[in-house]
Curated annotation (Swiss-Prot):
Protein family (similarity comment): Belongs to the TRAFAC class YlqF/YawG GTPase family. RsgA subfamily.
Protein name: Small ribosomal subunit biogenesis GTPase RsgA
The keyword Transmembrane helix is assigned to this record: no
Organism phylogeny: Bacteria, Pseudomonadati, Pseudomonadota, Gammaproteobacteria, Enterobacterales
Disulfide bonding pattern of the chain: none
GO terms for cellular component: cytoplasm
Organism whose genome encodes this protein: Klebsiella pneumoniae subsp. pneumoniae (strain ATCC 700721 / MGH 78578)
Superkingdom of origin organism: Bacteria
Amino acid sequence: MSKNKLSKGQQRRVKANHQRRLKTTAEKADYDDNLFGETSEGIVISRFGMHADVESADGSVHRCNIRRTIRSLVTGDRVVWRPGKDAADGVSVKGIVEAVHDRASVLTRPDFYDGVKPIAANIDQIVVVSAILPELSLNIIDRYLVACEAQDIEPLIVLNKIDLLDDDGLRFVNEQMDIYRNIGYRVLLVSSRTQDGLKPLEAALTDRISIFAGQSGVGKSSLLNALLGLSEDQILTNDVSDVSGLGQHTTTAARLYHFPHGGDVIDSPGVREFGLWHLEAEQITNGFVEFHDYLGRCKYRDCKHDTDPGCALREAVENGKIAESRFENYHRILESMAQVQVKTRKNFSSSDD
C-alpha cells in the first residue's frame, strides 16, 4: 500500500505548527525575563520544591523560583540569580535562579528510588557527632567515616555530653578516641550543656562550610544552639527520653546558618544516617584509611580479609598495627551491606511483578 506524501506547503504548515507548539510550551514552562533585574551572585541557604532561599552578597535573603533548565540545586550551591521587579498592580515577583556554579564538593546519600541523591554542596568537612548517651558506638562512627572517605570530604569527630563522665569514664573514652587520633582523624570532646570544649570546636569550624551528622539523641541540635548562640525555639531540640534513651529528630529541611565566630553550617535531616548499601566492597575497604598500607600484600589476590591464610590485614591486627575494633566493624559493615542489598533486590523484583 502506497503512502500519500505531503506537499511542500503542507510540510511547511506542519513544521510551523510544531515550532509554535514548542514555543508555547517553553513560554509556559519558564519565566518572562522582563520580570527580573540584573544578575547577582548568591548562595542557596535552603531549597524546597521549585523554590529556593538565596542569600545575596549583602546578607539579605530572597525567595526565588528556579529555572527549569537547572537539573540539580541544593543547599550550599553558589548561584547566579536575579531579583524580581514589581509587576502590575503592585504585585511583587519572586527572584529567579539562573545558573549554578561548579561544585567544589557534593554530599550525597543513597535513595532506594532515585539512586544517589545530592543533599548539600560545597561542604568542607563533615562533623561526625557521637555521644556517651544513648550509647558510644564505634561501629556507627566507623560507618560515618567510611561515608566521608567515599565522598572525599574531611571528617571531624565530635564526642558530646562529656559532662556526664567521671574521671575513669573520661579516661576510657579518651582511650577509645585514641584509635582515631592514631590514624590521623581529628577528635574533639565537648559538652553542649556546660559548653566545655566549644572553643576548639569553634576554631575547627571557622572559615569552613560544615555539616553535622549523627544519630538522633547525640545532641546535634543542642550543639548547634550553643555554637550559633540561638535560643531553643529557633533550632528545636528534644531531651533524651529517660525511658528509651533516644532523642527525637526535629529538623525538617536542610538550611545553611552562619556562625558568629565565622564559618557556616548546613543542618540537614538527610545526614542523620549515611546508607552504605550502594557502595562496592572495595569502596568500604578503602574507607578504612589504615588498611591502605596493607592492601595488595595478601597471599591471595581474592583475599576476603577474614580467615584467609596469608591475609596482610589480619596479620596487622594481630601485630597491633590495626585496631581490632576497626577490623571487626569493617566486617560488620560488609555483612550489613550484603543483607540490605539482598532485601533491596527482593523488594524491587516483587514490585516488578
